[in-house]
Amino acid sequence: APSMGFMGMR
């Protein structure tokens, strides 16, 4: 889940 949020932010 954290991976998706990190990519979305970038």
From Swiss-Prot:
It comes from the Eukaryota. Keywords: Amidation, Neuropeptide, Secreted. Expressed in the antennal lobe (at protein level). It is found in: Secreted. GO terms for biological process: neuropeptide signaling pathway. This is Tachykinin-related peptide 6. GO terms for cellular component: extracellular region. The modification Arginine amide is found at R10. Signal peptide: none annotated. The keyword Secreted applies. It comes from Acrosternum hilare (Green stink bug).
